[in-house]
Amino acid sequence: YFGKEFISQNECQVVAVESGQKGNFYQKMLGVQFTSVGCTFCPKLSQSLENIQASQPNRLAVVSFHKHLNGQDPMYIEWADKLYNKMQELYEGDGGLPAFYLNGHGNQIVSEQYKIEAAMKKEMTSYPTMCGVAIRSKLEGDQVTVTARVKSETEAKYRYLIYLVEDGITKHFQAGADGLYTHNNVVRAVLANNLFGERLNKGNALVSGQEYTAERTATLGKDWVSENMRVVVAVMASNDGGSTYYVTNCNECKLGESADYLYK
């Protein structure tokens, strides 16, 4: 991935399982936020996202990428620029910060809460999910192992992305904020090599009624606080033959813990 540590390229496993559930999978959306400690208006977007998460619990997971602006951002990772530039290229954007993309596609939203809420409502209507996501994560010392588990209700091809994020970072200044500021959802690493995720089942379609798993490993950075970290797994689909991908469902858990499939 874009960072200091090596990520293993483990083979995907296929396990036949009985569904045991009725109805569709619950749809959880991914908010991709671009921010910077040097951005005066960025706290407004963070507040909008916090408001939405409070009013719609468990509907939106947020991953926050820090970029350099008006100086160096200590939480910057290389993936931030690569993804930001690609999003600006593919979708309408103004080239500035803050920037927000729901489920990794669609036009850029700056910070307006009502626009994000409208986009979420439209997403559920226009892009309903047909798959579920579960997570197993293990932490031994500074070694992390994450297993993404995916089941689909239809025969379809998917990709996946695994993020390691950290909450509760208070040691860094934030422009536009008074006094002590808490940085949450900070992306420490993306456990992938492709901006649009890694292929599930070697790029072959998933069969309905079977579970597919993919594993990634990483080494924690020395200044990361593991107790404040989470794992976010996003599963991506394409409606244009693989030219672009969007997040069709996601899930999250505390680092070292697990999360089961979510159903309506």
Go through the PLM ranges and name each one.
Residues Y1-S19:
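N-terminal targeting signals for export/organelle localization
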Residues G20-K67:
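Local sequence-structure signature of Cys/Sec-based thiol-disulfide redox active-site neighborhoods
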Residues S64-K264:
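Short, conserved sequence motifs used for protein processing/export or organelle targeting and
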Residues Q9-E11, F41-P43, G141-Q143, T213:
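A short linear-motif detector with a strong N-terminal bias
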Residues V14-F25, E166:
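Short, charge-rich amphipathic segments
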